[in-house]
C-alpha cells in the first residue's frame, strides 16, 4: 500500500461516525485480486524493491495504492500475471472484481481501478 498519508473514508450519520482506513480498503482490494483468475502475485509499486512477492497473507497490501477523493476511491494495483493468460482480459476482470468488491463493501463509488502488469510468471 502507498506510504502516503491519506485521509480515511469517513461518513457521518445520526447514529455516529464510520471511518474506513486506506489499509482496510487495500485489504478489500487484495482479497478481490486474490480471487481473480490469472493473477499469481503482487509487485511493489516502487522500483527500488524489484522482488516479486507471491500473494501471501502478510504481503497482501504490497502492490496496492489507495487514493481517497472527496466522493470516490481510486486504486492502483501492481500485479504479476500467469504466463499464457490474455493480459487484457485478466486486467479487465481484475478491474471489474475490485470495483464490485469495493462498491459493495463501502457503498462508495470507485472512480478508477488501474492495473499495472509488472511481470509474467512462467512457472
Predicted feature locations:
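Contiguous, often N-terminal, cationic amphipathic patches that form binding interfaces
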Residues: 2-83, 87, 92, 108-123
Amino acid at each position: 500500500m502507498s506510504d502516503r498519508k491519506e485521509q480515511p473514508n469517513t461518513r457521518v450519520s445520526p447514529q455516529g461516525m464510520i471511518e474506513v482506513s486506506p489499509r482496510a480498503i487495500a485489504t478489500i482490494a487484495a482479497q478481490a485480486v486474490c480471487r481473480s483468475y490469472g493473477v499469481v502475485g503482487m509487485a511493489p509499486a516502487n522500483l527500488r524493491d524489484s522482488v516479486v512477492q507471491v500473494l501471501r497473507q502478510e504481503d497482501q497490501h504490497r502492490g496496492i495504492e489507495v487514493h481517497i477523493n472527496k466522493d470516490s476511491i481510486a486504486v492502483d494495483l501492481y500485479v504479476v500475471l500467469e504466463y499464457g493468460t490474455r493480459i487484457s482480459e485478466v486486467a479487465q476482470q481484475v478491474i471489474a472484481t475490485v470495483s464490485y468488491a469495493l462498491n459493495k463493501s463501502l457503498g462508495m463509488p470507485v472512480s478508477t481501478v488501474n492495473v499495472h502488469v509488472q511481470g509474467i510468471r512462467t512457472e
